[in-house]
Design a protein with these regions (language model features):
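Short, solvent-exposed aromatic-acidic interface loops
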Residues: 92-99, 120-126
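A short, structured loop/turn motif at beta-sheet edges
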Residues: 11-15, 50-51, 80-87, 106-118, ...
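Hydrophobic/aromatic beta-strand elements that line small-molecule binding cavities or substrate pockets
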Residues: 6-8, 74-81, 101-109, 121
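Glycine-rich portal/gate segments that line the openings of hydrophobic small-molecule binding cavities
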Residues: 29, 39-96, 148-164
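Hydrophobic ligand-binding cavity/cleft-lining segments
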Residues: 1-50
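Amphipathic hydrophobic-ligand
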Residues: 1, 97-104, 143
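A conserved amphipathic terminal alpha-helix motif
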Residues: 122-164
């Protein structure tokens, strides 16, 4: 199993950072919400409760082309815990390297008035042979992209500094 952790500080209040990652749910229109970003896509299948706990989504995101999936991975994810303006976690199953992942982000108030964001993800390929051959490289690739995505979203709110 692989684990990745990254920390950022952003010049924005905690509630604005939270809202960037957890936008208010629009009134039902009969269609699913879809978020598209550079190289990826998230489709909300079920909204979850008023805070997003229980939300179910499918995600498409880049992976190395040598996995034979055309450079695209897919995951099915459920948000398992939410503490508004503070913490959210999810569990996921993904392919093409069949795997289980968990992830979370936690927001904290920093002494200088900025907001700290810590993102943690674990990744575990089911097949022991594929785990040995590919897990480290695939997770490193996904982790780099996750860091870029988090940093780009935070940069919309204010100046961002990577802390670790």
């Amino acid at each position: 199993m692989r684990r990745h952790e990254v920390r950022f500080a952003v010049d924005a209040p905690r509630h604005r950072v939270w809202r960037a990652f957890h936008p208010r749910v629009p009134p039902p229109t009969g269609s699913r919400r879809v978020f598209e970003y550079d190289g990826g896509r998230i489709e909300i299948i079920r909204e979850g409760d008023e805070h997003g706990e229980g939300l179910v989504r499918t995600c498409e995101f880049p992976v190395p082309r040598w996995l034979g999936s055309g450079g695209v991975a897919r995951s099915w994810e459920v948000v398992t815990e939410v503490r508004p303006d503070e913490f959210a976690s999810y569990e996921a199953v993904g392919k093409p390297l069949w795997s289980r992942a968990t992830g979370s982000h936690e927001l904290t108030d920093l002494p200088d008035g900025r907001t700290g964001l810590t993102f943690v993800e674990t990744y575990d390929a089911f097949n022991p042979v594929l785990r040995t051959l590919f897990e480290a490289r695939v997770h490193a690739f996904i982790s780099r992209r996750n860091e870029q995505t988090y940093e780009a979203l935070l940069a919309r709110l204010g100046r961002v500094e990577r802390l670790s």
